[in-house]
Amino acid sequence: QELVDVEGKTVRNGGTYYLVPQLRPGGGGMEAAKVGNEDCPLTVVKSLDENSNGEPIRIASRLRSTFIPEYSLVNLGFADPPKCAPSPFWTVVKDQSERLPSIKLGEYKDSELDYPFKFERVYAASKMYAYKLLYCGSEDEEEEMMCKDIGVYRDQEGYQRLVVSKHNPLVVGFKKAESSTT
């Protein structure tokens, strides 16, 4: 089965979408924020504004198809990233100062992890398609590669960070971004 957006249409490989939370309440879509000592907005967070779709995100699979099959590995990147960011692509960074590995904008260190995420359907009822976002990789060299939920962690500054977590999985839907580039 292929990924389907909130309107019941097939998610296009390389297309641009908003990732909007499907469980309310709890904030809006995904965006980049300056967190901690960052000089540039590099940390991926859920918007605190429930009415915000967040920033448009390009979703791509290495498969040569027009659609994205469910459970296939994908890369995610902001369609219009901050100019100061090293890359538009989402990656997982384990920082000693943070409790959980966070999703940030950055370069991949390993070509195997060029497509480190996947979506797993949670439920589909009355045209409501919702998916968990998972990170498929290892956080250190000794650890075996496996898929783990991406959850939300509210930090001391009040940001709702996207983190690799066993608790509070993020459940999203795909909302097509209106743009001349999609």
UniProtKB/Swiss-Prot annotation:
Q: Which family does it belong to?
A: Belongs to the protease inhibitor I3 (leguminous Kunitz-type inhibitor) family.
Looking up InterPro entries in the UniProt record yields: Kunitz_inhibitor_STI-like_sf (IPR011065), Prot_inh_Kunz-lg (IPR002160)
Q: What PROSITE patterns does UniProt report for this protein, alphabetically?
A: SOYBEAN_KUNITZ
Q: Which organism is it from?
A: Psophocarpus tetragonolobus
One matching Pfam family, short form? Kunitz_legume
**What GO MF terms are annotated?**
serine-type endopeptidase inhibitor activity
Q: Which UniProt keywords apply?
A: Disulfide bond, Protease inhibitor, Pyrrolidone carboxylic acid, Serine protease inhibitor
At what positions is Pyrrolidone carboxylic acid found? Q1
Q: What is this protein called?
A: Trypsin inhibitor 2
Disulfide bonding pattern of the chain = C40-C84, C136-C147
